[in-house]
Every structure is written in structure tokens, then in C-alpha cells.
Amino acid sequence: MKRLAMIAACYAVPLAADPLDLIDYEALFAEKAADVMEVSETRSILCIGDITLIRDESLPRGYTGIDEGGQGAMGCFVSILATIESAMQACEAELPADQVETQMAYRTQALTFYGQNTVPEASFELVEERYNALVASQIEGARPFCSNLDLVTTLADRVFSDEGAAEISGMMSTPRLPVANPCL
């Protein structure tokens, strides 16, 4: 899965703490100020369960998040789904019907999980709007890879397999912030 995640990185936008930009990190750091650890003049850390949030102005969005729970980072999974979808659109290709069915089911489950676990909680409609914007933002960047579409179909084969299903089910089994790191 790690090799396939690296393939996805070729298509995906840089991962921050929250690829759909829905988590209010400032509010979390303010609300849990007593739990914030200042580790340097520019960096502070907040641990919420198995999620470690890092605030650092040198980061692309000022924050990043690391899911240390072992189930997999939901933000990464949402980014991979968006990568597959944007590549299929960019290359005017289609996945096999059974994979499309699985993809749509995962998309609905993942976006529901995302909205329920972001802070503040977000409606499915807002999460879907942000997801669609992420997909659209990746289409142009995916076009040069159309000659190597097998990279994406291999990723889809892996993600939408029975083995992948067990990983995805485990990933969605524990409510937590949908951060993007580590990426599978």
C-alpha cells in the first residue's frame, strides 16, 4: 500500500493536516490551550487521542496532523479517492463497474466520516463540495500521466480489493480527526 500511496502522491496536491480544509485548528489550539506543548519559538504541539497536531508558520497551511493510531489517516484516504477520481476524469477513462460501485460506497462512507469527525462538525453537503473541489483541482495535473494510467488503475485495484476493504473498514472504525499523515 505504501508504494501505491507514493504513486498517488504524483497526482495529489501537497497533503496538509486536512486536505478538505475543514478542521478549525486555531479553535482546537485555543480550546485546549492547557494541553498545548510549546516545543520551540515557532512550533507547538497538541495531542488529541492518537492525533498529534503541529502548529508551525513554516508549514504550508500553518498546521499539520499525524494520525498515530495505526488504522490509517482518513485525510490520506480521502485524498487517494480524489486522486483516482480526478485521474479517471482527466484521462476520460472508466474503472470496471464493480470498482466504481466500491469507489462510490467508499466515497460516501469516507465523506460522512470526515464530516462527523472534523471540528467543528461539517455537513455532508459541505464535505462533498470540498471533495469535488479537490478532485477538480487535480484534473489538469493528472493529464500528463494519462499515458501511464496503469499506475492509477493499479492503485484502484489495490484500494478496491478485498484486502483493501479490511484496511478501509479498520480505518473508519475509530472516530478521530481526519488528518492526512501518514499517508498509508
Enumerate the language-model features and the residues they cover.
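Basic, ligand-binding patches in group-transfer machinery
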Residues: 17
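Eukaryote-specific, low-hydrophobicity, charge-rich regions
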Residues: 53, 60-69
